[in-house]
Amino acid sequence: MAEKIVMKNGQLQVSDRPIIPFIEGDGVGHDIWKNAQAIFDKAVEVAYEGKRHIEWQELLAGKKAYDKTGEWLPKETLEAIRESLVAIKGPLETPVGGGIRSLNVALRQELDLYACVRPVRYFDGVASPLKEPEKTNITIFRENTEDIYAGIEWEAGTADVKRVIEFLQTEMNVNKIRFPESSSIGIKPISIEGSKRLIRSAIDYALKNNLKKVTLVHKGNIQKFTEGGFRKWGYEVAQEDYKEELLAGRLEINDIIADNFLQQILLNPEKFDVVALTNLNGDYASDALAAQVGGIGISPGANINYQTGHAIFEATHGTAPDIADQDKANPCSVLLSGCMLLDYIGWTEAAQLITSAIEKTFKADIFTADLAFGKQAYSTSAFSNQILSIM
């Protein structure tokens, strides 16, 4: 009988027939999901000789949800993910204007998915702008709920922003706003709790995966108390909770200014194993790193709360409406995110089957259009069928 995944004593409890919700996604979501689901199902069947099976449960979000329910993110969808703990999703459209914030950000904040985890690695055969892309093998831990993504801001010229500026000037003696009459104002919250839980998760991940170096990426040279606090609290976590690992040489923790980090990932990417970043810096760095190994079409991602067990694994690219329903999209982002999901629930054998099949497909010079670069471009279904045949 199919059962929901639950958290007991800090550990996920996963039956042989777990219920896992999925959100198909908008745009190319339909093309990539129908192929990805077939690959997930076969990998599980082969890896466990038919003894395990995922019971997929479709949830609505994005344009598909709006067309059917009049809501972009139905409460039922949020509640189903809360109850099931683990879910996977395709790309979601967010309408421009109308006061509706990013659906992806809404999901992360509503479920307190504080860690955005993005493993970035190179696959042989994939075109890259780097001479030695194989040196790039970095896992990003991006804080997911704070920073400017909290959405606390006021528009220039409004009564609200005038009140904020007046308060800053009269009550806080702030005199550094260059053009107070025409400025928009935003607030950047960075908390001790938010920073420490993110950095603790990054360190735990490094130790679990036998990775030694954890690097704190920040702009503490300019923003002393927010970005600088992130750096300070990261070192505190290491000293308070991981002193034994530090003394034994199993863990090294260091830090780097964000702009220097963006240089070093090009010049010396092998210097980094796991990196922890604030939200905005993590946004920049994750897409920059993805470009080094072939682009976001092959970049997986997960949004995780390691304390509650809640996790959403997702395609990291957009909806690409220009190629929707044309069987052209690259399914690898959602496939590799699915591998992260399988690893997360302990089904590593199935994840390894898919990863290995993708590696062999690339080595055989079989690519979708975004990675072909003058070579023959394969359709989504043809590319996926090649993976299925290898498994």
Swiss-Prot record:
Binding locations of D-threo-isocitrate: 102, 104, 108, 118, 142
Family (UniProt): Belongs to the isocitrate and isopropylmalate dehydrogenases family.
One example of a Gene Ontology biological process annotation: glyoxylate cycle
Entry-linked SUPFAM superfamilies: Isocitrate/Isopropylmalate dehydrogenase-like
Binding, Mg(2+): 283
Xref: PANTHER family: ISOCITRATE DEHYDROGENASE [NADP]
Protein name in UniProt: Isocitrate dehydrogenase [NADP]
Signal peptide: none
Keyword entries, A-Z: Glyoxylate bypass, Magnesium, Manganese, Metal-binding, NADP, Oxidoreductase, Tricarboxylic acid cycle
A GO MF label: NAD binding
Cofactor note: Binds 1 Mg(2+) or Mn(2+) ion per subunit.
Enzyme class (EC, first level): oxidoreductase
A Pfam family recorded for this sequence: Iso_dh
Swiss-Prot/TrEMBL catalytic activity: D-threo-isocitrate + NADP(+) = 2-oxoglutarate + CO2 + NADPH
InterPro entries (UniProt xref): IsoCit/isopropylmalate_DH_CS, Isocitrate_DH_NADP_dimer_prok, IsoPropMal-DH-like_dom
Site (Critical for catalysis) location in chain: 149, 219
Free-text function comment from the UniProt entry: Catalyzes the oxidative decarboxylation of isocitrate to 2-oxoglutarate and carbon dioxide with the concomitant reduction of NADP(+).
EC number annotated for this UniProt entry: 1.1.1.42
The protein's assembly and partners: Homodimer.
Cofactor(s) the protein requires to work: Mg(2+); Mn(2+)
